[in-house]
UniProtKB/Swiss-Prot annotation:
Highest classification ranks of the organism: Archaea, Methanobacteriati, Methanobacteriota, Methanomada group, Methanococci
Biological role: Involved in the de novo purine biosynthesis. Catalyzes the transfer of formate to 5-phospho-ribosyl-glycinamide (GAR), producing 5-phospho-ribosyl-N-formylglycinamide (FGAR). Formate is provided by PurU via hydrolysis of 10-formyl-tetrahydrofolate.
Gene Ontology CC annotation, any one: cytosol
Binding site for ATP: 112, 153, 158-163, 193-196, 201
Annotated protein name in UniProt: Formate-dependent phosphoribosylglycinamide formyltransferase
GO biological process, any: 'de novo' IMP biosynthetic process
Record domain ATP-grasp: where: 117-306
GO molecular function, one term: phosphoribosylglycinamide formyltransferase activity
Amino acid sequence: MVGTPLFSNAKKILLLGSGELGKEVIIEAQRFGVECIAVDSYENAPAMQVAHRFHVIDMKDGGALRAVIEREKPDLIVPEIEAINTDTLKELETEGYHVVPTANATKLTMDREGIRRLAFEKLGLRTAKYEFAESLEELKEAVQRIGIPCVIKPIMSSSGKGQSTIKSERDIEKSWDYAKSAARGIGTKVIVEEFIKFDYEITLLTARTSEGTKFCEPIGHIQIDGDYHESWQPHPMCAPTKAKAQEMAKKITDELGGYGIFGVELFVLDDEVIFSEVSPRPHDTGMVTMVTQKMSEFEIHARAILGLPVNVDILFPGASHVIKSEILKWAPEYEIHEASKVKDTKIRLFGKPIAKVGRRMGVALAVSDDITKARENAEKAAHLVNIK
């Protein structure tokens, strides 16, 4: 049951992190009459622009996080990013607050060490070979054991920040410094992973709902330096490999528990499925579902956490391509007229208050009976957007 926003009977969602994914979640939640509060570390973040109200705090500060939650008393606490004091969330959960999907899932998935040990050591899922290192010397030893090339990532980071590929011994120190710079201020530990020459990688959006677990069609994607660049749906998979992917996704999401959508990232090599990462929230590669599915990943997430039925059917093949800034500027302006002329394509601008070089500022979405054509149109439209 939901009430009326801004009245005493309102159903309240408090969103921790107010980026472009959270913005879409709030839009979908508001369609059901949910009162939405957005929280982030800076003013005028995308989700704040559509929320009923917002707060600006350091979400890694447990005291500040507790204060805003106790003030708002939300029915649902919905993390949208990883840079949150998850120990405080676990405490609040024991006091009766509802964290989506669970506080433990939020804590595990913000920590590459925790989720990798869960996947490989507890659940027996196939992963890349890995080791952890807390110093430059430990990193050198780990690289020697894993072999070159290998991938290094901070255990606490997101969107490819701090991730690099070591291609020779000369890269080790540079990769170590880069990883430390992106570690969200929580330690210096890194994970060193075997470099897998996979055939392709997918995101399998997995919805845990009151009606059971449901899977969206696989989303193929390309990342550059660990950051989302383009995605398309559906990505073709043979039935046995798809079944393996769904089995793996169900194992990891069942262990994490709760309701909502999970972005399960998988590598596929010779029809074998290899676990990479999981996010207990909508996934950036899943933005393509805004034009491909009957319900986008954001509507699915909102419905699932509210206990409502979901539909994961695909309507059209389609693609998404990021719109990135090439400048540094407050309150940027966008020339979108030419981009809007591209056939069967839509432009979605996030409304970020500052443009930075390489920052995602929007996406171009395209549909077509031919995935290749959809990808071409999305890329064309994205590159026609002029940010100035």
